[in-house]
A protein has these predicted regions:
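Amphipathic alpha-helical dimerization/coiled-coil segments
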Residues: 2-49, 118-140
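Functionally engaged cysteine thiol sites
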Residues: 75-77, 100, 134-135
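Short alpha-helical linear motifs
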Residues: 89-93, 131
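Beta-hairpin "wing" of winged helix-turn-helix
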Residues: 98-108, 115
Length: 140
């Protein structure tokens, strides 16, 4: 069974000549060409900030810490028991979460008590919603 090929236009699109499918070309033209498309993409500084946030979330240990802190503020000794890693590794992970303002630590006597920030709570809720939507689409 032969596959039908999509009709491709060989016309000037944007500021250069490339072969692209007609629907893609039409949508690109509607957006103002390549310049219009590029105007919708965040600048490199914003993309760098977003990538660092996603890197912070891309580790199961850090997600475990954040989810534990959703329940209540915790001291390092309890967090260490939850994630079962060495002090140096835990410190590394906590610092990444603090740098992204996902958690905060407050000195209380001899302890540092960690809490999830509003930003951290919002990010977790957002990823949870996204995850539920993905599971719903896969189940359909």
């Amino acid at each position: 069974m032969a596959m039908r090929r999509k009709r491709i236009l060989k016309e000037k699109c944007c500021d250069f000549s490339i072969d692209i499918p007609v629907p893609i070309q039409n949508e690109l033209i509607r957006k103002g060409g390549l310049k219009g498309l590029l105007s919708q993409i965040p600048d490199s500084a914003e993309l760098l900030i977003n990538s660092r946030l996603h890197q912070a979330l891309a580790d199961p240990i850090r997600l475990t810490v954040m989810n534990a802190l959703l329940s209540q503020p915790l001291c390092v000794c309890v967090i260490k028991e939850v994630v079962k890693i060495a002090d140096s590794k835990l410190s590394y992970h906590l610092n990444i979460l603090k740098e992204q303002e996902l958690i905060s630590g407050e000195q209380q006597g001899n302890w540092i008590i960690y809490s999830i920030t509003d930003r951290g709570r919002q990010v977790l809720k957002s990823t949870e919603r996204s995850e539920k939507e993905m599971r719903g689409r896969v189940a359909s």
